[in-house]
UniProtKB/Swiss-Prot annotation:
Matches recorded under SUPFAM superfamilies: Stabilizer of iron transporter SufD
Name of the featured protein: Iron-sulfur cluster assembly protein SufB
Biological processes, Gene Ontology terms: iron-sulfur cluster assembly
Gene of this entry: sufB
Subunit structure: Part of the SufBCD complex that contains SufB, SufC and SufD.
Family in the record: Belongs to the iron-sulfur cluster assembly SufBD family.
PANTHER family referenced in this protein's UniProt entry, alphabetically: FES CLUSTER ASSEMBLY PROTEIN SUF, UPF0051 PROTEIN ABCI8, CHLOROPLASTIC-RELATED
Domain of life, source organism: Bacteria
Record's function text: The SufBCD complex acts synergistically with SufE to stimulate the cysteine desulfurase activity of SufS. The SufBCD complex contributes to the assembly or repair of oxygen-labile iron-sulfur clusters under oxidative stress. May facilitate iron uptake from extracellular iron chelators under iron limitation.
Length: 495
């Protein structure tokens, strides 16, 4: 069931075509990969490769059986052909070449440096080319995920001194079993939806984070997801728990090689925030967007946070510039009294990209507050949709929501769509909703051109100003990166 590719030191970069996507290289290396297809034996094989206990296998099998009873959804404001799930491989990892590769998943296989047997010289070279530090040096902790496995996690020992757990999901299953069993599937059940059920059945490595009571995480935590193998899907499972009176800021980034066929990314993120705790969760999404309506990543993700305790706070911030189709709604369940949910989003589509993204704010506790700031930019022949739900439950006395949804059109062939849903079951609630749709004005462009600014630079400046409310919520270095990605995505959208 495994496949080996000749291992070389060569890291090949894709430079062809009009698309400027410098992350589109692929890395040649030996891989341990399951044959294409999904069935109960494949689910068992994934669990066996990861040396998982019986309870985790049962979680997978229950989700797989639920998934078989579900139908693939197509209600989004975008089109994709029905996927052949037998045409994907559901496990791919760098191979050491000496065994069946389960050694890197065994308890104790992770070295003090945070690296394991999956971190080959080819994998390290790939992350170096991406600018992702898999060795300690920069003051940001990184969990590097390559296809189905975590290959390195930095600053684990330093964080452990304060009781912070920062490790791969696979390692957490072995070393922090009680915590994983306590929280796994509590926010996103294994049968939550079609793609969440698929994820639960074939889940690959994501990141597990636990911040103990009264601890403020001393550095940014981050995960970088890299898809390398062809005809594989990535199905990471991430769990983040902030105990009482704690704080953590977490960032994720991603990229994939240029391929001429779709690849599936169906992740699940569960965040649990206890009393007086705060979590900031930032995403800079840069999956391969496809080229001339060919290939790209299908980014079908379920992200959900539970503000369990009083005065808890969750902030989602996302910059979405990649993937052929983006379909995700990072959500907050505001159960604790006085809890706060925030959603800040920039979604840019160009070329033939399609996006249907937004958020859900579910108010349950008293005096809960939510803020939604969404900026959508459409260029080329793309379609960009915002879809949001604000739900005020009967118990949510004095709940408040503010929603601002702005769309910008660049060119005559793109589209922007808005689908706001409001359900209010408590008459003490206050809800505000603002929405605008605009084009870049000719007078704005003329003003810039008269001052020697090129048309592309002028559009980039105007769009960055349009998005400043969201970029200001990102950590500084990631805000700069998000602005660069925005400019690159707009390069061929003028005219």
């Amino acid at each position: 069931m495994s496949r080996n590719t000749e291992a070389t030191d060569d890291v090949k970069t894709w430079t062809g075509g009009p698309l400027n996507y410098k992350e589109g290289f692929f890395t040649q290396l030996a891989t341990d990969e399951l044959a294409k297809g999904i069935n109960e034996e494949v689910v068992r094989a994934i669990s066996a490769k990861r040396n998982e206990p019986e309870w985790m296998l049962e979680f997978r099998l229950n989700a797989y059986r639920a998934w078989l009873e579900m139908e693939e959804p197509h209600w989004l404001k975008a089109h994709y052909d029905k996927l052949n799930y037998q045409d994907y491989s559901y496990y791919s990892a760098p191979s050491c070449g000496n065994c069946d590769d389960t050694c890197a998943s065994e308890p104790g296989a992770v070295q003090q440096t945070g690296a394991n047997a999956f971190l080959s010289k080819e994998v390290e070279a790939a992350f170096e080319q991406l600018g992702v530090p898999v060795r300690e040096g920069k003051e940001v902790a990184v969990d590097a995920i390559f296809d189905s496995v975590s290959v390195a996690t930095t600053y684990r020992e330093k964080l452990a001194e304060q009781g912070i757990i920062f490790c791969s999901f696979g390692e957490a299953i072995h070393d922090h079993t009680e915590l994983v069993r306590k929280y796994l599937g509590t926010v996103v059940p294994g049968n939550d939806n079609f793609f969440a059920a698929l994820n639960a059945a074939v889940a690959s490595d994501g990141t597990f984070i636990y911040v103990p009571k009264g601890v403020r995480c001393p550095m940014e935590l981050s995960t970088y997801f890299r898809i390398n193998a062809e005809k594989t899907g990535q199905f990471e499972r991430t769990i983040l728990v902030a105990d009482e009176d704690s704080y953590v800021s977490y960032i994720e980034g991603c990229s994939a090689p240029v391929r001429d066929s779709y690849q599936l990314h169906a992740a699940v993120v569960e965040v649990i925030i206890h009393k007086n705790a705060e979590v900031k969760y930032s995403t800079v999404q840069n999956w391969f967007p496809g080229d001339n309506n060919t290939g790209g990543i299908l980014n079908f993700v379920t992200k959900r946070a539970l503000c369990e305790g009083e005065n808890s706070k969750m902030s989602w911030t996302q910059s979405e510039t990649g993937s052929a189709i983006t379909w995700k709604y990072p959500s907050c369940i505001l159960r604790g009294d006085n809890s706060i949910g925030e959603f800040y989003s920039v979604a840019l589509t160009s070329g033939h990209q399609q996006a249907d993204t937004g958020t859900k704010m579910i108010h349950i506790g008293k005096n809960t507050k939510s803020t939604i700031i969404s900026k959508g930019i459409s260029a080329g022949h793309s379609q960009n949709s915002y879809r949001g739900l604000v739900k005020i439950m009967p118990t949510a006395t004095n709940a408040r929501n503010f929603t601002q949804c702005d769309s910008m059109l660049i060119g005559a062939n793109c589209g922007a769509h808005t689908f706001p849903y409001v359900e209010c079951r408590n008459n003490s609630a206050q809800l505000e909703h603002e929405a605008t749709t605009s084009r870049i004005g000719e007078d704005q462009l003329f003003y810039c051109l008269q001052r020697g600014i090129s048309e592309e630079d002028a559009i980039s400046m105007i769009v960055n100003g349009f998005c400043k409310d969201v970029f200001s919520e990102l950590p500084l270095e990631f805000a700069v990166e998000a602005q660069k990605l925005l400019a690159i995505s707009l390069e061929h959208s003028v005219g």
